[in-house]
Each structure stands twice: as C-alpha cells, then as structure tokens.
Amino acid sequence: GKNATVLHYSDNNSKTEDGDLILFDVGAQYEYYNGDISRTFPVNGKFTDRQKTIYNIVLEGQKIVIDKAKAGIEFKSLNCILKDYYAKALSKIGLISNAEEVNKYYYHGVSHLLGLETHDVGRHNEGLLKSGMVMTVEPGLYIAEEGIGIRIEDNILIENNGCRVLSKDIIKTVEDIEDFMKW
C-alpha cells in the first residue's frame, strides 16, 4: 500500500488491504558479506492492470541497467541510463510530461556497492566499474498518489564483458509472482 512508497518503512504497523502491494527489502549475510534484495508482491496474489504496467516499467529498467553494467562503465552513468528510460516510459503512460518529473517518482540511486556492509563504503558513485565489484541494481518507482511503490533489486558481480546476476533464481516477473502467490 502507501507505505511501499516510503524507501525504508520501518514502523511495520499498518494493515495490508486487498489490492495493496508489499515491498520486501531483504538482507542476508554469508561469512560477513551482505546481500540486499527487493521484490514487490500483490497482497491478494494478482497485480491490477496499473500495478502491472508500473511493475513492468521497473523490470524493464532493471534489465536495461543490468545489460549495460560491466567493467569500464562509469558508475553514475547507470543511473542516467535508467532515468532516461523512465522519462520515456512514464511519459508514454501519461504519468509525466517532461524528463525532470521523473524525480517525483524515482528518488534514489539505481545501485550501491555490497560487501562487509549492506551499503558498502567508498566513493562508489565516482569512477569506473571494475571487475570483481559486487553491487545492487535496484530501480524503483513510487507513486504516492496511487499507493503504488515498486522496487526490484538484485545483486550483480561486475565482470570484464558484462555482469553476473547473483540473485537470478529469485522470481521477479509478473507471471512468476502471480503463479507463486496461488499456492
């Protein structure tokens, strides 16, 4: 519901309603190294048409960024790539009328480094990606006036010719989520 539009809603005291979305932001640790995954699921098991449209925009944005992520790419360019895509996609569905309005619905970066801290230290938003870096790709859209908050976050390992999605086995398509919710 509306709390999915809050980046890190920690009160955890609201009742979910039929038609709401739940945004899960989940961390895990293995031998002191951290993972950080987000998924968004419909409470009732089915996305509305509008939720599905927004969800698929976020998912496509994530795919675009993952396809561009590789050693030698400027870190901050990934956020620019996503915002350019969002400007076109959100304009196409009538949510915005100019590119500057993207910031109303997308107000965080597309990535952060992972390591001994979930948001690992360093000047990661400057410079080039290097082979061996582990980071998130976490586009989101937060439409408070519609109660829609969607983030899809995966962890990737930067390689010379691309990246490896470390969290690839966690479901994230609309179809897979709705099938999972049937059980």
At which residue positions do the language-model features occur?
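Active-site neighborhoods and metal-handling regions in enzymes and metal-associated proteins
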Residues: 1-183
